[in-house]
C-alpha cells in the first residue's frame, strides 16, 4: 500500500464504534457523539442524540420519523455520489442496497480509500437503490450471513410460495412477520409484482414508515390497518406485522392464521421451528455468502475488515485468496432475530 497514512490511523474501532481521528467523526456510532456518519436508518446503526448527523436525505427522514424532529442538533443530508469534507477527510455516500436511503461511506484521506459498507445486499430490491461497488484499499464489511451454507433462493420463488399458500388455504389469514423498516415494504412490493392486487393489512408499527416510503416514490398499493376487524374477517388475506407481534397477543385477533416469517435465518429450519413459523420465507436484506464473495471480488480490496457477524468463514476465504483480513468485532450491532416491537429497537433483516 503506497498511501501516506495507515488504515488504522484513518478508521479505528472504539467502544463507541468506528472512529476517524483526522476527520473527528464516527461511522454508525452506538452511542451519542459529536459527529456521526450514519449509513442507514435501522436502530442499531442510527441512534438519536448526536451533535451532527451526515447521511442521505432519506435516512435523515427515517431518523426524524422514528426519533422525532429533534433527533440531532444538526442535519447534513448528502446525495448519493456527493462528497462532503471534514478536516480534509472526504466522505462520499454510495448506495448499499439494504433499505431505503442506505449507503456505504467512502472515506478518503491522503490517497487512502476505505469503504464502510454498513449493511448491504446485492440482489434487486424494488424499494431502494441497488448496491454500487467501489474499488478501495480497505473494504469494511458486515458478515451477517458469512458462511457458505447461507445461499438464499430467489425472492420471487419465496413470494411465490406465499401466494401459493394463499390459494391452498383461502379461509386462513396469512400473517407475515417482517421488520418495520425495509423488509415489510419490500415484501409488499414483491407481492404486488407477483400479481397480488388486494389490500394488504398492516400492524400499526408499520403505518408511518409505509407512508414515508410512499412519499419517497415507492408505490405499495392499497394498504389497510389490521385493527377493528372480526376475528374471521381476514380469511385469505395478507397481514404484515413486526415478527414479535406474531407471538404476541396482537396475533390472537386472527382465527387460525398461517404464520410466516420473512428472514434470511429461515434457511435454518431449527429457527423456524423455534419461532413456531408454519411458512418460513427466506427473504433477507443482507448479502448471502455468494453476494459477499461477489462484492469482495469486485471491489478488490488490499485489506478486508469485518465489523460484525460470522467472520470465521470470511477470514478463511481471505486467507485462501491472499487478502489481508481482520475481524473488528464491533459491539452493538444486532442480528435480525433480536427484533422486538417498538421504536428504537434493533429491526434490521
Model-identified regions with their sequence ranges:
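Short, polar loop motifs at secondary-structure junctions
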Residues: 13, 29, 38-44, 58-62, ...
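Active-site-proximal loop/helix segment associated with metal-binding centers of metalloenzymes
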Residues: 96-107, 120, 124-125, 131, ...
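His/Asp/Glu-rich metal-coordinating catalytic cores
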Residues: 5-31, 35, 41-182, 193
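C-terminal regulatory/interaction regions
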Residues: 2-5, 225-349
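Short, well-ordered alpha-helical microsegments
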Residues: 46, 102, 124-125, 184-188, ...
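Binuclear metal-ion centers of metallo-dependent hydrolases, dominated by the metallo-beta-lactamase
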Residues: 132-133, 147-231, 303-349
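Active-site regions of enzymes building and remodeling cell-envelope glycoconjugates
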Residues: 34-41, 50-57, 69-78, 88-91, ...
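Structural motif
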Residues: 52, 113-114, 137-139, 173, ...
Amino acid at each position: 500500500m503506497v498511501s501516506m497514512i495507515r488504515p488504522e490511523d484513518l478508521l479505528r474501532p472504539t467502544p463507541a464504534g468506528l472512529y476517524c481521528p483526522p476527520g473527528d467523526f464516527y461511522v454508525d456510532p452506538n452511542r451519542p457523539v459529536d459527529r456521526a456518519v450514519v449509513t442507514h436508518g435501522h436502530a442499531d446503526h442510527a441512534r438519536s442524540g448526536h451533535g451532527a448527523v451526515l447521511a442521505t436525505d432519506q435516512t435523515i427522514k427515517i431518523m426524524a420519523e422514528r426519533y422525532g424532529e429533534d433527533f440531532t442538533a444538526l442535519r447534513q443530508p448528502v446525495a448519493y455520489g456527493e462528497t462532503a469534507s471534514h478536516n480534509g477527510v472526504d466522505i462520499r455516500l454510495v448506495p448499499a442496497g439494504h433499505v431505503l436511503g442506505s449507503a456505504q461511506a467512502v472515506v478518503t484521506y491522503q490517497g487512502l480509500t476505505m469503504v464502510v459498507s454498513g449493511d448491504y445486499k446485492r440482489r434487486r430490491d424494488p424499494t431502494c437503490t441497488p448496491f454500487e461497488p467501489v474499488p478501495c484499499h480497505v473494504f469494511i464489511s458486515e458478515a451477517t450471513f458469512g458462511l457458505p451454507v447461507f445461499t438464499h433462493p430467489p425472492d420471487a420463488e419465496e413470494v411465490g410460495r406465499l401466494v401459493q399458500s394463499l390459494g391452498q388455504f383461502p379461509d386462513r389469514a396469512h400473517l407475515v412477520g417482517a421488520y418495520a423498516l425495509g423488509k415489510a415494504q419490500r415484501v409488499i412490493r414483491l407481492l404486488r409484482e407477483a400479481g397480488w392486487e388486494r389490500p394488504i393489512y398492516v400492524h400499526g408499527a408499520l403505518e408511518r414508515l409505509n407512508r414515508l416510503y410512499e412519499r419517497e416514490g415507492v408505490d405499495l398499493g392499497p394498504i389497510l390497518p389490521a385493527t377493528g376487524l372480526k376475528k374471521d374477517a381476514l380469511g385469505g388475506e395478507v397481514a404484515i406485522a413486526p415478527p414479535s407481534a406474531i407471538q404476541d397477543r396482537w396475533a390472537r385477533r386472527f382465527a387460525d392464521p398461517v404464520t410466516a416469517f420473512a428472514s434470511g435465518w429461515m434457511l435454518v429450519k431449527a429457527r423456524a421451528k423455534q419461532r413456531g413459523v408454519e411458512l418460513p420465507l427466506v427473504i433477507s436484506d443482507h448479502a448471502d455468502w455468494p453476494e459477499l464473495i461477489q462484492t469482495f471480488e469486485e471491489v478488490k480490496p488490499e485489506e478486508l475488515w469485518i465489523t460484525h457477524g460470522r467472520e470465521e468463514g470470511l477470514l478463511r476465504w481471505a486467507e485462501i485468496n491472499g487478502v489481508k483480513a481482520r475481524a473488528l468485532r464491533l459491539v452493538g450491532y444486532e442480528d435480525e432475530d433480536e427484533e422486538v416491537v417498538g421504536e428504537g429497537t434493533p429491526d434490521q433483516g
